[in-house]
Amino acid sequence: SGPFKVKEYKEGESITYERYDDYYRGKASLDQVIIKIMPDQSAQEAALQSGELSVMRVTSQTKLDKYKKDDNYTVYNIPEGRLNYLAFNYQSEIMKNEDARKAICLALNDDEIVEGAYGSEELAKPAKNFCSPENLYYNDEMKGYQQNIEEAKKLAKSSGLSGKTLHYIYFQQRPNMKETAQIVQQQLKKIDVNLEIEGMDGSAFFPHLFAAWI
């Protein structure tokens, strides 16, 4: 269904796609595309600078600013349509309480998360509903929660959330997730909620997130 098809997959190393000549919108201009699997961002940069890589995803404001100033590179802003979100575990007794969930939402500041974890809205934008702002079905009329610490404290106290310690897991291979978790941790401290944060690789994170909760 796309302009390329899988030619070779080397686990943990690379995926090679070759052109699919029968693509209904016509042949692609490239014969093949090789995607290198490089979890280490320093290795990515070294490969880009040596010419081993033609394209690299930039996930930090510092690197974005650096490459924008360097005439040897061209920076493209391509919306991913990806949505990063906080999911509540409804099997947890405290998370079954709607006021506890509201308290958490009211304690968070999306703008601070974007600024602290990404650097600016050049790399991420706050989403106020369950679609990214680039999605066709994004609803501008939905405003989401606005940070209100005093109201969050009241709800946290009345729901029994105050003084609790919550366990927060994140996918550690995905950029900016650790920084996001740390900012959320600091914001929840303002309403007397402690957060234990734990990064997991894919083999642990996804089974824990989906299979373990069902």
Regions found by a protein language model. Give the residues of each.
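Ligand-binding "clamshell"
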Residues: 65-77, 212-214
